[in-house]
Amino acid sequence: MRYMKYGELRINLENLLGVYIEREEVGDKYVDDNSEIVIQSFNFDNSISTTKILCKFELGKKIINKLANLLSSEYINIQSVMIIKKEFIKVWYSNSKKDCLVEDFNGELIYIGDDRDALLNIDKELDKDEQNVFTVKWG
């Protein structure tokens, strides 16, 4: 199993979002001109570098697909993804997670494993119900 380093994560996000992420030190924050995305790096437990992403929903759907591709290529290091329909998606990355746990807003277990199709199915389900909120956790 190969884990993505922070520099690799930054490059992948730049490719996905089409933005140059200059700051990557702990505590720094990147905000784009249109407030479409906020990227903030911090220490998860004083040893794990974690990046937090908050962005609008349509951009979040692109991130979901990117995460599925990362899973299929064994870049498995996502800690959790929170998707709020038509509002925001929160994506948490860290360098020490692998298995995927999917719960709905009420904490009901939907899926556990590391299958990329699970994320794509969640993506499809989000289109059906504007009130759906999912939390996806790895680790």
Task: Report residues per predicted region.
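Phosphoinositide-dependent membrane-docking surfaces
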Residues: 12-22, 88-89
